[in-house]
Amino acid sequence: MEQFMQCLKKISFLAYGYEADDESFEIADSAKVEFVNGLVLFLSKNKSICPSGHGTCTYGSWIWKDKPLNGNPIVAEFPSLPVKVEEDGRYLSIKDLNNREIIAVSKDGADYYYPDGYIEVNFDYLNKYQK
């Protein structure tokens, strides 16, 4: 798994279950993660048909480039939060320097025949450090 250091700057995402009163976030299907050095990571989760042919499945994905979000994104900004980015062909993880996972993306949930890919965002962590 490839690993490199970055400084997290801003996360924009579409969230469902957003509580405007206490500014907390719950579920995301897509996100745009921006780093201080200008790198941009776009995350998404999509439904499809299982390769097994039995029902639907989900796939998580990520692309390293700038891409707009559809809809009205919610933005969480950080004062240059240092993070570790770990990536291989099927999984991406963004962790703080204490190894707490902030964002995880799995392309297929480690199951080829019944994929259950996902985007996991540690909203408690983001709410704590949000501007």
Per-region residue spans from a language model:
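Surface-exposed, interaction-prone regions used to assemble/regulate multi-protein complexes
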Residues: 1-131
